A protein has these predicted regions:
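Short, highly charged, low-complexity non-transmembrane loops/tails of multi-pass membrane proteins
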Residues: 8-10, 206-226
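Hydrophobic transmembrane alpha-helices
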Residues: 2, 13-84
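Membrane-embedded alpha-helical hairpins and interfacial helices in multi-pass inner-membrane proteins
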Residues: 134-208, 221
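Alpha-helical transmembrane segments of integral membrane proteins
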Residues: 28-40, 61, 65, 84-89, ...
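Alpha-helical membrane segments and adjacent membrane-interface helices in multi-pass membrane proteins
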Residues: 61-121
Length: 226
C-alpha cells in the first residue's frame, strides 16, 4: 500500500511539474513571438510604403518582402509547430493592409486565401517540425503581398485609373508597362525562389532550437536533482 501511495504521489508531482513546465514554455513562447509579430507587421508596412516610391519598387516589393520578412516569420514557425500558423500570418497581413488603407479586390481575396491554404497544406505534408516544411511553406506564403497587387493584371484599366488619381499620370504610365503576364510570372517565380532561400538561410545561420533544447535539458536535470 505504501508503495502504491508513493507511486501515486510521484505521478502527481510529475504531472504538476509538467503542467508548470508547459505554462512556463507557453509564456516564454508568447514573449518571444509577440515581438516577432510586431517586427513582421513593421516590415510589411515598410515594404508597402516603399512600393509607392517608384513603379520599379512596386514590382520588386513582393520578392523584397519575401527576403526581409523571412527572419521573424521563420522564428515564429519554429516556435508555433501547429496547424494554422500561415492562416494567422495571413490575418496579420490583412490587418496591416486595412490599417494602411489598402483594399483587397475579390480576386485579391481569392489569391490571399489560396496562398494561405497552399502554405498550410505544404507544411502539413512535409511536417510541422521539419525544416523543409518551414522553407517550402514560407516560400508559398511569401506571395501574400501579391493579393492586392494582382489587381494590376486582373483589371488593368481600372487599377491604372486609381493609381493615376493617387500618384499621377507619369507613375501610372510607368506602372502600366509592367502589366504583362510575363512580369507576373517572373514576380511569382522570383518571390517563391528568394522566399525559400531566405528561410533556408535563417534556419542555417540562426540556430536557436538547439540552444533552447540544451537549456531545457539543463533545467530538467536541475529540477530532477532537487
Amino acid at each position: 500500500m505504501e508503495n502504491k501511495r508513493d507511486i501515486l504521489n510521484e505521478v502527481q508531482v510529475d504531472s504538476v511539474a509538467d503542467a508548470q513546465r508547459r505554462k512556463k514554455e507557453a509564456r516564454k513562447n508568447f514573449s518571444f513571438m509577440f515581438p516577432m509579430v510586431l517586427i513582421y507587421c513593421a516590415l510589411m508596412a515598410a515594404v508597402e510604403f516603399l512600393s509607392f516610391l517608384h513603379p520599379f519598387c512596386w514590382v520588386v516589393s513582393v520578392p523584397l518582402a519575401a527576403v526581409i520578412c523571412a527572419f521573424p516569420v521563420v522564428f515564429i514557425l519554429k516556435k508555433y509547430k501547429k496547424p494554422g500558423s500561415f492562416a494567422i500570418l495571413g490575418i496579420i497581413w490583412y490587418l496591416v493592409t486595412i490599417i494602411l488603407g489598402i483594399k483587397l479586390s475579390f480576386s485579391g481575396l481569392i489569391i490571399t486565401l489560396l496562398v494561405v491554404v497552399v502554405s498550410e497544406l505544404i507544411r502539413w505534408i512535409l511536417g510541422y517540425v521539419s525544416k523543409e516544411g518551414i522553407c517550402f511553406g514560407y516560400a508559398a506564403a511569401s506571395l501574400l503581398p501579391l493579393g492586392h497587387r494582382v489587381y494590376l493584371w486582373t483589371d488593368t484599366t481600372k487599377y491604372m485609373d486609381l493609381i493615376a488619381s493617387l500618384f499621377g499620370e507619369k507613375y501610372s504610365d510607368q506602372l502600366g508597362s509592367f502589366a504583362t503576364e510575363i512580369i507576373l510570372f517572373l514576380i511569382i517565380i522570383a518571390t517563391v525562389a528568394v522566399g525559400y532561400c531566405s528561410a533556408r538561410f535563417v534556419i542555417l545561420h540562426f540556430r536557436t532550437e538547439k540552444k533552447i533544447t540544451e537549456r531545457e535539458q539543463e533545467n530538467s536535470i536541475d529540477f530532477q536533482d532537487h
